[in-house]
Regions:
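NUDIX/MutT-family hydrolases
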Residues: 90, 101-133
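Short loop segments at secondary-structure junctions
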Residues: 19-21, 94-99, 114-116
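Active-site segment of metal-dependent pyrophosphate-handling enzymes
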Residues: 59-98
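Conserved Nudix-box catalytic region and its N-terminal flanking loop in Nudix hydrolases
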Residues: 18-60
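Acidic, metal-coordinating catalytic segment for phosphate/diphosphate chemistry
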Residues: 1-13
Length: 144
């Protein structure tokens, strides 16, 4: 369900861990980000949106979601000549799967250590989201 330009868009995505690495996807425009996508009418909640998008974009469908952490980012971008507000709900998940089948929406992927991922992520808000996730993991006894 894509909204009209100028109306609030909502997306959901995962910071996806595999042991001590996280998954980043590269978009055709060149930027690197986490798997995410727009909420659709058939989605029952934000977790189902994030999981559907993860599966569509990477082929990964088996994840364990950390329900104790969520981060919301908000920003505005230009779509069809109009400023469009967007909110993204980020969740933390883990998987044992490492093989990625990229969709047509992306050109590359990398599993990276958190420090390397933070350097590669294009947008500052997403770097901050990664730092927040890392703090949550550390407070839960994970040292990444």
């Amino acid at each position: 369900m894509h909204s009209r330009p100028g109306s609030l868009e909502t997306s959901c995505g995962f910071i996806l861990l595999n042991f001590d690495s996280i998954l980043l996807l590269q978009y055709p425009q060149g930027h690197w980000s986490f798997p995410k996508g727009h909420v659709e009418k058939a989605d029952s909640d934000h977790h189902s949106t994030a999981l559907r998008e993860l599966t569509e974009e990477t082929g990964i469908s088996e994840v364990s979601i950390d329900g104790s952490w969520c981060e919301k980012t908000e920003y505005t971008y230009v779509r069809r000549g109009r400023e469009t507000p967007k909110q993204v709900f980020w969740y933390l998940a883990e998987t044992d799967e490492i093989d990625v089948r990229l969709s047509h929406e992306h050109t590359n992927y990398l599993w990276l250590q958190l420090d390397d991922a933070e350097e590669l992520i294009t947008f500052e808000q997403e770097k901050e989201t990664l730092r927040s996730a890392r703090e949550h993991l550390r407070s839960s006894g994970r040292n990444l």
